[in-house]
UniProtKB/Swiss-Prot annotation:
One annotated GO molecular function: GTP binding
Transit peptide start and end: 1-35
Predominant subcellular localization, coarse grouping: mitochondrion
UniProt keyword list: GTP-binding, Hydrolase, Membrane, Mitochondrion, Mitochondrion inner membrane, Nucleotide-binding, Protein biosynthesis, Transit peptide
Gene3D superfamilies, per the entry: 3.30.70.240, Elongation factor 4, C-terminal domain, Elongation Factor G (Translational Gtpase), domain 3, P-loop containing nucleotide triphosphate hydrolases, Translation factors
A GO cellular component entry from the record: mitochondrial inner membrane
tr-type G domain span: 61-249
Family, as annotated: Belongs to the TRAFAC class translation factor GTPase superfamily. Classic translation factor GTPase family. LepA subfamily.
Pfam families in the cross-refs: EFG_C, GTP_EFTU, GTP_EFTU_D2, LepA_C
Membrane topology: Peripheral membrane protein
Protein name: Translation factor GUF1 homolog, mitochondrial
Length: 665
């Protein structure tokens, strides 16, 4: 009883102390949930909550949807930061540069991988000042700049009516600048040129204006001169967006119809879809259906990205936001799908062109028992990256795995890195390959994405082979033209164009086999041009070529995961490099290991990894020599038996090193 009295007295003292504490402390105790509210956190923007009634004040004519497109490192994400600060969407000095680059891989590599959307509210200077309500709603989409993520750019542009084309004032127009311009041009977007980084000592905005005029027929007077780093000239960007980019089309009184732009998986909320409202209005509680699958859903939550998720309860015509509708499977959220009012007949929106996969690679769990975990991780990640194709496959060497199609080698690397960082998956990748077409003597054709699927000695004779090619655009300083032409010739390239952009820079266009550029072409190009080259490519036609399948054999047994298709002229060199690399990374066994590269039944390269040998004569200090011979013969027979039944473990590092085998020497 005495103990209970002490506890009661202690509790009363604590309560009196809290009662005398500041009001903030008492409010936290009385309303603990408020401490966790995202709307109270300054990192979610200065505006706080946005209501549906506020969004109703923005009809389509007061909405602008625009994207920022540029070459890598020309200042897209920094410009996006400044615009978010200028509109009060995020606080100045938020301490996180490139705010919209949210993935760990983006921050580590310094590149944008995923297109990100942010809604901003902005009062145009020419608008009347009779109300505190912002006059315009601006949806900003920051896009990647690398060629491998052009699919992200094209999907983002589908939700926009205009684009800011950002060009570095010192570097000028680069290869990806050209590619992104034509993506926007073909989408009929209004393009506003922004010459960025004018604060640099080497900036030459007049020269950049001339390049824009010569290459794109853009009036030099239309270019905006800015520095996203210092803020110089930024005050003219948003007024130009409002005045020069049209409002989104759409019918406000029609049944709701929206385009599914992107999606990602949340463990608690399920699939979160990013959508652009084309017609009508979407409200919480509405019933919607998918035009692709026919499945119906109830809208559980709807809102905008400001720049984090902000529930509004409604989205109106022309606005871009998110929808949570109880989708639990990533297969239900098909990028480019049309979501519409349930039990109504609407015409589906055009959607997107399907992604064309340029690089294929096998993906296997480092530990075979982790296959289900890897399958789960890939399913969740492909919800956020719909440009990856996934099919299950089985390898004799590596067990159950997946054959994955990517848009390029960087895309493949980023996908692997995200698997590891976001899901803790440890994977083994096989040698990347491209889709080939083989024609047999009877006229039948087959597309081969996995070299192991092509029999080394098929019953049908191979009559012809085709490989995919690309049109490569290379921009370089004029003094490096010679070495670059030599590099392209070594990679079996055909020159299509050779022009000068200005007195210092040249533009080269080549038709190159895709196989020749997917591994190390860009690194070599950067090396021979001291880092000044820029490179972009677009897929072209298939061309006939002299191709052969090369197998890697360990102790006479082919390793299907290491099979590759090479050009006949380079088979000898590539085979020699492969077996040499394998010899370095395979651990020595108690038996001898022969490593061979073979085309059909013909071995073109070989290395031998000698066996570890136990000193069986250690206890023989003398005596009859026949005793020693008997021990040696017994050891020899044992090693032969081990070689017949022994298995060779191939470390993960060996597969990684095979990716680096050069195609150029």
């Amino acid at each position: 009883m005495a103990g209970a009295a002490v506890l009661r007295r202690s509790a009363r003292r604590i309560y009196r102390h809290l009662a005398a504490a500041p009001a903030f402390s008492r409010s936290v105790l009385q309303q603990p949930k408020r401490l966790l509210s995202s709307q109270s956190s300054p990192e979610h923007g200065a505006r706080g909550a946005v209501s549906g009634s506020e969004l109703a004040l923005y009809p389509p004519e007061r909405v602008r949807n625009f994207s920022i497109i540029a070459h890598v490192d020309h200042g897209k994400s920094t410009l996006a930061d400044r615009l978010l600060e200028l509109t009060g969407t995020i606080q100045k000095g938020h301490g996180q540069p490139q705010y919209l680059d949210k993935l760990q891989v983006e921050r580590e590599r310094g590149i944008t991988v995923k297109a990100q959307t942010a809604t901003m509210f902005y009062r145009h200077v020419s608008a009347s000042q009779d109300s505190d309500t912002p006059k315009y709603l601006l949806n900003l989409i920051d896009t990647p700049g690398h060629v491998d993520f052009s699919y992200e750019v094209s999907r983002s542009l589908a939700a926009c009516q205009g684009a800011l084309l950002v060009v570095d004032a010192a570097q000028g127009v680069q290869a990806q600048t050209i590619a992104n311009f034509y993506l926007a041009f073909e989408s009929n977007l209004s393009i506003i040129p922004v010459i960025n980084k004018i604060d640099q000592p080497t900036a030459d905005p007049d020269n950049v204006k001339d390049q824009l005029k010569r290459l794109f027929d853009i009036d030099p007077s239309e270019a905006l001169l800015t520095s996203a780093k210092t803020g110089q000239g930024l005050e003219q960007v948003l007024p130009a967006v409002i005045e020069r980019i049209p409002s989104p089309p759409g019918k406000c009184d029609a049944p709701v119809r929206m385009l599914l732009l992107d999606s990602y998986y949340d463990e608690y909320k399920g699939v979160i879809c990013h959508v652009a409202i084309v017609d009508g209005a979407l409200r919480k509680g509405d019933k919607i259906a998918s035009a692709a699958t026919g499945r119906a859903y109830e809208v559980l939550d709807v809102g905008i990205m400001h720049p984090e998720l902000k529930p509004t309860g409604v989205l109106y015509t022309g606005q871009v936001g998110y929808v949570i509708s109880g989708m639990r499977s990533t297969k239900e959220a098909r990028i480019g799908d049309t979501l519409h009012q349930a039990k109504s007949t609407v015409e589906p929106l055009p959607g997107f062109k399907p992604a064309k996969h340029m690089v294929f690679s096998g993906l296997y769990p480092a530990d075979g028992s982790d296959f289900e975990a890897l399958s789960h991780a890939i399913e969740k990640l492909t919800c956020n990256d719909a440009s990856v194709s996934i099919t299950k496959e089985t390898s004799n060497a590596l067990g159950m795995g997946f054959r994955c199609g990517f848009l390029g080698l960087l895309h493949m690397d980023v996908f692997h890195q995200r698997l590891e960082q976001e899901y803790g998956a440890q994977v083994i990748s096989t040698i990347p390959t491209v889709p080939y077409i083989f024609e047999y003597g009877d006229g039948s054709k087959v597309q081969v994405e996995n070299p192991a699927a092509l029999a080394s000695n098929p019953g049908k004779r191979v009559a012809a082979c085709w490989e995919p090619t690309v049109i490569a655009t290379i921009i370089i300083p004029s003094e490096y033209v010679g070495p670059v032409i030599m590099l392209c010739s070594e990679r079996r390239g055909e020159q299509l164009e050779y022009t000068f952009i200005d007195a210092q820079r040249a533009l080269l266009k080549y038709q190159l086999p895709l196989k020749e550029i997917i591994v190390d072409f860009y690194n070599e190009l950067k090396g021979i041009t001291s880092g000044y080259a820029t490179f972009d490519y677009e897929d072209s036609e298939y061309q006939q070529s002299d191709l052969v399948k090369m197998d890697i054999l360990l102790n006479g047994q082919p390793v299907d995961a290491m099979a590759t298709i090479v050009h006949n002229q380079k088979a000898q060199r590539v085979g020699k490099e492969l077996v040499e690399k394998l010899k370095k990374f395979i651990e020595r066994q108690m038996f001898e290991i022969t490593i061979q590269a073979a085309i059909g039944s013909k071995v073109i390269a070989r290395e031998t990894l000698s066996a570890m040998r136990k000193n069986v004569l250690a206890k023989c200090y003398g005596g009859d020599i026949t005793r020693k011979k008997k021990l040696l013969e017994k050891q020899k027979e044992g090693k032969k038996r081990m070689k017949r039944v022994g298995s060779v473990d191939i470390p993960q590092e060996a597969f990684h090193e095979l990716l680096k085998v050069s195609n150029s020497k």
